[in-house]
Regions:
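Conserved "HGTGT" condensation-loop signature of ketosynthase/thiolase-family condensing enzymes
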Residues: 1-85, 102-109, 116-244, 248-250, ...
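Short acidic donor-binding loop at the edge of a beta-strand
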Residues: 110-111, 376
């Protein structure tokens, strides 16, 4: 594509990996899962050379002991890339795509590998069986770059009152959102359960989903032996699920590097725009509990930069740790809450691998947009308690 500026950032490869062996000790460690996902991304691009030529290897922080996994991966692929390790936050993957795109555009990077993995499911089950999955030892080392900034998101007064986890906050956001719409409790529970049933149907068709068991709105809504009430109105089937083994990877590079590696133009996906934003860190300091000024500003700005309106966006994947996160984002961006708002099936069913879910959503979106050439896709990302946000619009 000689008409494209050589410094144009393009997403050329997306790979996902999932494992659920009958014997958990047969599972591979997260580092090996990352390698599998990166190789799948390179194969998706049709160019293993991208792994050899990478200038940056960025890893989304996970629940594992590696201090600089990017260096271990760099050594396996035999490249001399600069390594990066992110801070915590579900906003991280989209934020890294935004950062990579800017650096590529500015000539500060050529080929950026973005990857993350979690092996919580196998590790837990191996431990219950008195076994241990061996992890690669890494001498204490530091990445070339720490990506992002850790922020304190719980005020001491909030902690004193037991507000320390997402499940303490998001049900309150849900009730506040219901009240803002004037819904009764029962109307609201019915509507949210019906929305989550749609997410479940999408997940059942996604080969990389962790949970692919069909659930009706009634089954999602009502507590039961396998679906306990976690925080009203949320049952277990409305909560993010991180008890899983999943990995995902993206390869973002310059148009020039894509051509040099022999990546066919039909694999290219263009980041049309990307934005980041943040709400007030402490929930107790916010003006209300049913809105997000940062999503409104950063989300709409992403659309403005891409030159699209909500009605122009064909495919959407909103961060879906809990239903309130989806509804608040959809409302602030004027997308509406009645359309399909997931491509994966969401963090309950497709899976919520801690900080790395959005790597999966972008990877899934890549396949959707290639199948629907010329269409526009939106991915949103959320970290904390509707605190840290990132947005990306993509098209072929």
């Amino acid at each position: 594509m000689s008409s494209v500026d050589p410094r144009t950032p393009v997403l050329v490869g997306a790979g996902q990996f999932i494992q659920k062996p009958d014997n958990p000790v047969e599972a591979i460690e997260p580092l090996a899962m990352m390698r599998e996902a990166l190789e799948a991304a390179a194969d998706d691009a049709g160019a293993r050379a991208l792994l050899d030529r990478a200038t940056h290897t960025w890893v989304v922080k996970g629940a594992w002991p590696y201090t600089d996994p990017g260096r271990l991966l760099r050594n396996e692929f035999g490249n001399n890339s600069k390594t990066g390790l992110s801070t915590d936050g579900g906003n991280t993957p989209q934020s890294l795509v935004n950062k990579a795109s800017l650096r590529i555009q500015n000539g500060e990077a050529d080929i950026v590998l973005i990857v993350g993995a979690e092996g919580i499911w196998s590790r837990r089950r191996a431990k219950r069986a008195g076994e241990r999955i061996p992890y690669t030892d890494q001498a204490e080392t530091s990445p070339d770059e720490v990506l992002g900034k850790d922020v304190t998101m719980s005020h001491p007064v909030e902690l004193e009152r037991g507000f320390a986890m997402p499940i303490n906050f998001y049900p309150i956001f849900e009730s506040a959102f219901r009240a803002s719409r004037g819904e009764t409790i029962e109307q609201h529970r019915d509507r949210v359960s019906e929305m989550w049933e749609i997410f479940n149907k999408v997940a059942c068709a996604n080969p990389y989903s962790w949970v692919r068991n069909p659930m009706t709105a009634e089954e999602i809504r009502n507590p039961g032996p396998a679906n306990r009430l976690v925080g009203f109105p949320y049952t277990k089937a409305m909560n993010s699920n991180w008890d899983l083994d999943q990995a995902a990877a993206l390869i973002v590079c310059s148009a020039e590097a894509a051509e040099a590696a022999g990546v066919a133009s039909d694999r290219w996906l263009f980041p049309q725009s990307g934005t980041d934003g943040a709400d007030t860190n402490f929930v107790s300091n916010r003006r209300d509990l049913h809105s997000s000024p940062a999503i409104q500003v950063a989300g709409r700005r992403a659309m403005e930069l891409a030159g699209v309106s909500p009605s122009d966006i064909d495919h959407v994947d909103l961060y879906s740790c809990f239903p309130s996160a989806v509804q608040i984002a959809a409302t602030e961006m004027e997308l509406g809450i009645d359309r399909q708002l997931t491509q994966t099936g969401g963090l309950t069913f497709a899976g919520g691998p801690l900080n790395n879910y959005v790597t999966h959503s972008i990877a899934t979106m890549a396949g959707v947009l290639r199948e629907d050439a010329g269409s526009v896709g939106l991915c949103s990302a959320n970290g904390g308690y509707i605190t840290k946000h990132a947005f990306g619009l993509y098209s072929t």
